[in-house]
Amino acid sequence: LYQLKSNPLKGDNSFQIKNVIIEGYEKSNISEIENSVTEFKGNLIGLNFNSIKEIVESSEWVKRASIKKVLPSTLKINVTENDPYAIYFQEGKSFLIDLDGSIITEINLNNYEDDLLFVRGENSPELLEQLIRDISITFPNLTQTLEEVEFIEKRRWNLKLNNKLLVKLPDENIQQSLKNLKQLFEEQEVMESNIIEIDLRIQGRAALKVLDGKINYGIDEI
């Protein structure tokens, strides 16, 4: 809870803003939000709440904001912050992103300690949520082992697991391929094996690369 008690909007009107209360923040820049609010002149009765809402929501970390007037002289702002889901790499920079692909803020990866999913590839943030949804529906345990996802040539995904296993998904029918992958994991104990790559780009087939060569493994459609 943050409360600005001074009156930055000078005037004698009885409904002039004298208090600004900001709630729901943890990582948002409160000074930035405060300054954005104090730029508005007027009283609570004639204040443009949509404009304030838009400006507050343009601040880093703020996903949504609700604005409420509390007569006679208080403006109450409640913010909902973005929830970092992954780290997106683009042109040598690192960004925190939400599951829906919203870029939250740029970070220095060397100073960031949270263990988040790595995301690479053009257009990958916008398509991340659908990928995670497909995995959660067909092979939910896989989300626990995901370390990095990369959108290749703006058409398909590569998945890298925390044991460095690489999974190449096809352009289409991702859910079916994930079902096949789940079957393969169950039958071959993949995480404990010497398999280093599973290529699922050809529907109904899995090309397995192991440490000492490459073998083919047929998977019937489920």
Label every PLM stretch briefly:
Residues 20-22, 33, 56, 62, ...:
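Buried hydrophobic packing residues in well-ordered domains
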Residues 21-60, 108-133, 137, 172, ...:
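Periplasmic/extracytosolic POTRA-like scaffold domains at the N-termini of outer-membrane
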Residues 1-23:
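Aromatic-capped interface at the extracytoplasmic side
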Residues 49, 67-73, 110-111, 151-152, ...:
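Short, glycine-/polar-rich solvent-exposed loops and beta-turns at beta-strand/coil boundaries
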Residues 24-26, 79-83, 108, 121, ...:
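Flexible glycine-/small-residue-rich
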Residues 53-83, 102:
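Membrane-embedded segments
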Residues 172-222:
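Extracytoplasmic/luminal low-complexity segments enriched in Pro/Gly and acidic/polar residues
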Residues 75-153, 160, 166:
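Extracytoplasmic segments of membrane-associated envelope/inner-membrane machinery
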